[in-house]
Amino acid sequence: MTDEKRVRTLQGKVVSDKMDKTITVAVERRVKHPVYGKYITRTTKVHAHDEENQVKAGDTVIVRECRPLSKNKSWTLEEIVDRATVV
């Protein structure tokens, strides 16, 4: 048997990069309403570690779960999927 754990990853959009080495990522998921059956978009914000401060607000990123790095930060930047266009 393998002792390797499955690493959780999330894809979302960066909504804040104001903190040093930390980004806030908004992750959207669709859930079905228990009574009406309509699909609703729910948003969860997670703080992720960005060692080189390379991500800007509006970028689409993939983050992976890691050991707790602070009180609120348990995710780290895995890769940048899409850069936001600079206007």
UniProtKB/Swiss-Prot annotation:
InterPro entries: NA-bd_OB-fold (IPR012340), Ribosomal_uS17 (IPR000266), Ribosomal_uS17_bact/chlr (IPR019984), Ribosomal_uS17_CS (IPR019979). SUPFAM superfamilies: Nucleic acid-binding proteins. Pfam families: Ribosomal_S17 (PF00366). Coiled coil: none annotated. GO terms for cellular component: cytosolic small ribosomal subunit. GO terms for biological process: translation. One of its GO terms (molecular function) is rRNA binding. Keywords: Ribonucleoprotein, Ribosomal protein, RNA-binding, rRNA-binding. The keyword Coiled coil does not apply. HAMAP family: Ribosomal_uS17_B. Part of the 30S ribosomal subunit. One of the primary rRNA binding proteins, it binds specifically to the 5'-end of 16S ribosomal RNA. Belongs to the universal ribosomal protein uS17 family. This is Small ribosomal subunit protein uS17.
